[in-house]
Amino acid sequence: MNQELNKKLVKTIGEVKWYNIRRCYGYIAGEDGEDAFIHKNDLPFWTIFLKPGDRVEYTKEFTKKGIKAKNLTII
């Protein structure tokens, strides 16, 4: 089942709800109405300074814990 979840990747657009640089994580509100978790380890170096309202494109990864954002770029 774990392998099935990781194979389901969907590219989408959203807006940063919040990102805490000290805690190294935050959330994105997807245009599809689904929030996605984002962690510093999944961000390119130049995007670690995300701020609320930044529009981003990312790939949603469906995990047992919920949706995780990967391959994020600011648009």
Where are the language model's segments positioned?
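Short boundary/loop segments of OB/S1/cold-shock single-stranded nucleic-acid-binding domains
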Residues: 1-12
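Short nucleic-acid-contacting surface segments enriched for D/E, G, S/T with interspersed K/R
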Residues: 44-57
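Short aromatic-glycine-enriched beta-strand elements
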Residues: 22-28
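A short macromolecule-binding patch
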Residues: 34-41
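OB-fold/S1-family single-stranded nucleic acid-binding modules
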Residues: 61-75
